[in-house]
């Protein structure tokens, strides 16, 4: 293959506006760039021929792994037969209708309909509009506030960026905007009182939520949104009984629950949905990444029976609902989704995420938890994180300017493995494809241990 990497890199730095990237550093050539050319299984290869084990599945999304011919063939066949038709005013395609049925068959109990978008961000925008519409139809125009959590990630639009509880996505964007509020993150490692048990900390979080609701006025609070396990905020599993205690508060004040399952949906935690894994009872579920394993852009809002009945009432009163995207239920993306869900079933991907995930976290903990600068190894399913601390006893943060997380991620990449330096705190995250084998997990663990040892020897 002709090596065009230098030419492509030059074009990249001259013309490509990358997401979540230091713009000046990239344009000036001060930060690394990489042109990815291919992928197979859990590996990607760049234009220089360098191969890396992708232990973050792109962005938590390539669940079935790279190079699945079945999905590629489904996309090609759909493009040849019918590349596009819209879904407005009752139009559908065989692919979009079949995929809807497949999603509902796999969804938690009580779910009714699927509205399709293209990204998790636009799906959460849809959720907010539906929540407001729902309360207007019920004659509660003042019930509009949405409570999210610090460290949560729900997108990077205006409203979804407001829902996100990470400074990177607020800085200089005039975010967050009303009517979004943020409450305590269920971050047990960073609990305010180290003597708290998990159950006590869960109660503390629920009490903080209830205090906020009472202070704002329950009649003004419409919904609470949360990822089953915090993802971009640090891969933080909820402490024991957290979701049960949160649900009790929401039920008490008639507040809807949105489960943002963009990351956890379709197997990541060893169950089809994270809501089932943690016993959540959502009114809306956000889906995206695992729906197509990122072979095509597709997201969705799964609507509960409870909400659907009110939405129907709204159409009977006001006519057609004024919400839609040109590419909603795009048939090519839907075809990718069908093939992907079939592969998940055929390959036993969900079960593998549970068993291999348990093995991976156990081996990772054995390998690095004893290091003087490792504060915690945590995770669930095929999600794991290593949090670094300057002082293990008092869990002291490193100075942010030292960029410990990025240093470890860079050292890991030098050893042929991709992890992610999470955007807030010195945390190295892992979320590999759900087809990861134990042998591949061992490769990740060894590389991580070597990278951590090397970085901390030099500081």
Positions of the model-derived regions?
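Conserved N-terminal phosphate-binding loop of PLP-dependent enzymes in the Aspartate aminotransferase
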Residues: 1-459
């Amino acid at each position: 293959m002709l090596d065009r990497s230098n030419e492509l890199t030059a074009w990249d730095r001259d013309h490509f506006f990358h997401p979540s990237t230091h713009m000046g550093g990239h344009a000036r050539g001060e930060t690394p760039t990489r042109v990815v050319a291919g992928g197979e299984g859990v590996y990607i290869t760049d234009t220089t021929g360098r191969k890396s084990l992708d232990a973050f599945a792109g962005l938590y999304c390539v669940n079935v792994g790279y190079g699945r011919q079945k999905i590629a063939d489904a996309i090609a066949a759909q493009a040849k037969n019918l590349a596009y038709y819209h879904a407005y005013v009752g139009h559908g395609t065989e692919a979009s209708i079949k995929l809807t049925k497949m999603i509902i068959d796999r969804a938690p109990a009580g779910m009714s309909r699927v509205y399709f978008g293209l990204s998790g961000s636009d799906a959460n925008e849809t959720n907010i509009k539906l929540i407001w519409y729902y309360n207007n139809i019920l004659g509660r125009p003042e019930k509009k506030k949405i409570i999210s959590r610090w460290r949560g990630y729900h997108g990077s639009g205006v409203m979804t960026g407001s829902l996100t509880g990470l400074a990177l996505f607020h800085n200089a964007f005039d975010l967050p905007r009303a009517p979004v509020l943020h409450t305590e993150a269920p971050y047990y490692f960073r609990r305010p009182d180290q003597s708290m048990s998990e159950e006590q900390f869960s109660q503390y979080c629920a009490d903080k939520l209830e205090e906020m609701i009472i202070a704002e006025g329950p009649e003004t609070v419409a919904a609470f949104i949360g990822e089953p396990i915090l993802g971009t905020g640090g891969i933080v599993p909820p402490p024991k009984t957290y979701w049960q205690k949160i649900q009790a508060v929401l039920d008490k004040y008639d507040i809807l629950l949105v489960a943002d399952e963009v990351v956890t949906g379709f197997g990541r935690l060893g169950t089809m949905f994270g809501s089932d894994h943690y016993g959540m009872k959502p009114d809306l579920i956000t889906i995206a990444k695992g729906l197509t394993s990122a072979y095509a852009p597709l997201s969705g809002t799964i609507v509960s029976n409870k909400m659907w009945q009110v939405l129907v009432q709204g159409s009977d009163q006001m006519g057609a609902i004024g919400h839609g995207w040109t590419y909603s239920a795009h048939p090519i993306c839907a075809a990718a989704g069908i093939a992907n869900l079939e592969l998940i079933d055929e390959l036993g991907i969900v079960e593998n995420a549970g068993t291999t995930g348990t093995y991976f976290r156990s081996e990772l903990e054995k390998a690095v938890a004893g290091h003087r600068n490792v504060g915690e190894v945590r995770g669930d399913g095929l999600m794991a994180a290593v949090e670094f601390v300057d002082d293990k006893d008092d869990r002291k943060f490193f100075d942010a300017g030292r960029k410990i997380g990025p240093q470890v991620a860079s050292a890991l990449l030098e050893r042929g493995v991709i992890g992610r330096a999470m955007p807030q705190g010195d945390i190295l995250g892992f979320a590999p494809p759900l087809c990861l084998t134990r042998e591949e997990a061992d490769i990740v663990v060894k590389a991580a241990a070597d990278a951590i040892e090397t970085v901390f020897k030099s500081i």
